[in-house]
């Protein structure tokens, strides 16, 4: 167990397609037809089956597939004291699709005591063995800050927190509490999921904030500072990684653009062990920004797409790995899909079998490049 530290040569980002049993049970719970305990029993059963599949696939990380969540990010945010669940009159906009309308509203001092995800983690941890370690995924602190200022949310946030620095400090402290509680529960692998950096890469967003008189570098540095504040004092044996995302809803995307605008900030200065980076299509740009990754940090190349069932050509993927090697040594590189398979309940447009075929391909390529 002591030698298992994320990331792994063949890896995955966290979420899996929701089984129909989960979808049905959640719908029945929402309609008041079953109790919370009955829903939890279904979730436990389906998560157990998922972990069995992860182990059979040879994965060294195990997760709950985010089966207990509606969204990859909001459910975690709703677990903080001082954060309320709300519905907006619209969702997030992707290419040709709109998500459901969930969001958050700050209602008091933000804190992280008794976060429900700690219990979620404990359920997964019981399945650890000498070949696998339980991993907890969560939205990055910067993602919470971005949601608090998403469109009209910012007016309420500023009313509750007129001192912006206090807001940053409270968010960071809340995360430190959750990280501490997870660590005390035995967690040694945490993954931040962070779409803010993918957003910063997008020319449309860059133009939007420029019109508002905001400098991209200033906003990026604030988000970096917040993430690092949340990581202060983390134990040396706790692996913490960041997945940078450009949106992944029902096989669509939200932002585009290479990593050049953020690389000198994020890659050089975020206090994590590794970055999971999307590189599955031209929206992600080239590998040149990898030159900014700080010494000792690893990069997990997201070269296999979860947005399509089509299996990538092995030789082409291997060639791209060696192309990335021009900027970062091969022993600091790993391979994974570019994102999860279901960032929310709806999931991407592929079947359960196609999902596992993708992960099988990741493993086969990794073993060919780095050995078994």
Roles of regions detected by a PLM:
Residues 1-372:
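Domain-level signal for soluble alpha/beta catalytic cores
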């Amino acid at each position: 167990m002591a030698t298992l530290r994320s990331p792994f040569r063949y890896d995955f980002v966290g979420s899996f397609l929701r089984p129909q049993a989960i979808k049905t049970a959640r719908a029945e719970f929402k309609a008041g037809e079953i109790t919370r305990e009955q829903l939890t029993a279904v979730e436990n059963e389906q998560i157990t089956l998922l972990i069995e599949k992860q182990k059979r696939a040879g994965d060294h990380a195990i997760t709950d597939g985010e089966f207990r969540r509606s969204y990859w990010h909001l459910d975690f945010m709703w677990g903080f004291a001082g954060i309320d669940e709300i519905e907006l009159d619209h969702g997030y906009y992707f290419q040709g699709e709109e998500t459901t309308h969930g969001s958050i509203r700050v209602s008091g001092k933000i804190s992280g005591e008794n976060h429900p995800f700690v219990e979620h983690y404990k359920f997964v941890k019981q399945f650890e063995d000498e070949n696998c370690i339980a991993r907890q995924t969560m939205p990055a602190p910067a993602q919470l800050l971005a949601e608090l200022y998403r469109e009209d949310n910012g007016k309420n946030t500023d009313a509750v927190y007129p001192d912006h620095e206090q807001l940053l400090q409270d968010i960071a402290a809340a995360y430190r509490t959750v990280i501490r509680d997870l660590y005390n529960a035995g967690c040694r692998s945490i993954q931040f999921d962070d779409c803010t950096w993918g957003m910063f890469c997008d020319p449309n967003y860059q133009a939007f904030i420029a019109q508002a008189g905001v400098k991209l570098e200033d906003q990026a540095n604030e988000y970096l500072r917040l993430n690092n504040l949340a990581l202060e004092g983390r134990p040396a044996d706790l692996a913490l990684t960041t997945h940078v995302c450009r949106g992944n809803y029902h096989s669509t995307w939200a932002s585009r653009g290479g990593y050049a605008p953020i690389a000198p900030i994020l890659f050089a200065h975020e206090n994590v062990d590794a970055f999971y980076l999307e590189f599955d299509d031209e929206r992600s740009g080239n590998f040149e920004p990898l030159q900014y990754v700080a010494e000792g940090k690893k990069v997990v190349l997201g070269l296999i797409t979860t947005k399509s069932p089509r299996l990538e050509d092995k030789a082409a993927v291997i060639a791209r790995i060696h192309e990335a090697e021009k900027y970062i040594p091969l022993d600091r590189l790993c391979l994974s899909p570019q994102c999860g398979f279901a960032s929310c309940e709806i999931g991407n447009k592929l079947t359960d079998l196609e999902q596992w075929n993708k992960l099988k391909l990741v493993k086969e390529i990794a073993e060919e490049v780095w050995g078994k």
